Amino acid sequence: MVIALSDSFIENPRSFLQRFQDALFAGSKPDLQGTLGIDEEVSNIFATEERIRKIPNYLDCKWSELKTGQLLRLQGMVQDTNFGHEFFAGAVEVNENIWRGCRYILDFSEDEMHLDESKIVLDERYSLFLTNVPGERTLPVIEALGNWGSESLKERSLKYSNRLQASNDTGVCVKCYGGMETKVQVCQAIDVIGIYEEPSEYSDGLPILHMLCFKDYTQSATQAPSPQQAEIIRPKILKYFEKVLGENIAAESLMLALLSNVVHKTTGLVIGGFTLNLTNCTSELVSQLVSVLRPLIKRMVIQKVNVAELNRKPLYPLSDGETLDTSHLQVAPGTLIVLDETELSSGTLNDVGCRNVQFLSSLISQQDLTFFYPFSSFTVHSNVRIIILSHGRSILPADVGCRCRGDSPDTIEFPTDSDELQEFCNFFHMWNMRANIPENMLDYIQSTYVSSRQYNKEINEKTLSLQINCSRLYAKSFGRQLVSRIDFEAARSLINHWTVN
């Protein structure tokens, strides 16, 4: 019986990696620059979703049963790309001109540990701190820590609680080889295949995953609907939104905001993003809306915006120069951020509160997520979706405002049929789809703009930009990748009901 290479690799990954390195170094002193082709080899072995699913998922395993050296898969967000750097023996000369590769090989014989320096080629690795994708999935970390059977490990893990957003979140140290750390960005959600190493005093109680390869983890794999399917699903979702918001225009506007996606960004200009401010909201309405959105949007965080909350602690990632504290809004691309202003009243902001407002304004208007250090700061691009729920006009710079009903709706009976619910989820997976404007539509849009300006001088380039952006979102809501006249005219009509900020 022939065993598939993927099955053989899962059963004994270190044996495969040892043979691969030994063959690569045969007859010559190793050059340890780059990944050695290991990442490509592993990616090819697990090139299909069927093969990848055979790899045990770290989030589904009982931690007490995990053993050093086994192959694991893990999805998470990169909280910090600068979590450590170390040198180690990347290869050793076991006989004259016969070299043994040591990358990913976590056990050494006594003889190999006491070799002369001339018989060792040094390698280096960089560490990332990976945690749960905010708003997506959590683990009962206390129970898991108990599985390790050591109170001292449990205590040491608390050292990194400042990097975790919730008490039941977990952190993993991911070690990168051959420059792979340069391909990863902070806040990026990644899907990693690697070699597991059990927590120890050496790792300060953190589990370790030695990265073999990774890919971007946008969201759980789903099948976006076809245009025919989207046309059927769309009105069903709008029906639920309208029940909560009480207005068809507000429901349509919310749908477009949930499908927004930054497609291009230059200094001072963000294309594709769409921040909606729903006004006339109550706390009860917010609660109902969140309960409707939560099963549909796989990454969603709720942030109250009031004086007490703004003054309480930073909403931005903050470093003291030694360690990086996470924040509630250090989130991965594609996350929906719901800003709840319904409890906002007059008051005085302290220094933290002022910085939080500045941070939120930059996040909304520029899609910049700012990290603050003692004497500097830096920003990373953040492709997030944002809706603001408030009584009156928001204190934050939303693109448009739209009034909803305001009174508390009756209990919403959301679909319990799993297939229909999955269809709804798949619909909003279209947020990262791109709808383009064909050449013939560009001429139509330009002529329409010129004609509109003759009758209404208040229509300007900002209005035109909003019309174009919303026509793209409208096309996406029907599963179409090309904008039509119908989409553009529908967007123009919708904008007439908005307050453009």
UniProtKB/Swiss-Prot annotation:
* Keywords (A to Z) from UniProt: Cytoplasm, Nucleus
**Disulfide bonds listed in the record:** none
Q: A single GO molecular function, which one?
A: chromatin binding
Q: Where in the cell is it found?
A: Cytoplasm; Nucleus
What's a single GO CC term here?
cytosol
Major location category of this protein: cytoplasm
One GO term (biological process): nuclear DNA replication
- InterPro entries to which the protein is assigned, alphabetical: MCM_complex-bd (IPR019140)
Family classification? Belongs to the UPF0616 family.
Q: What is this protein called?
A: UPF0616 protein C1687.04
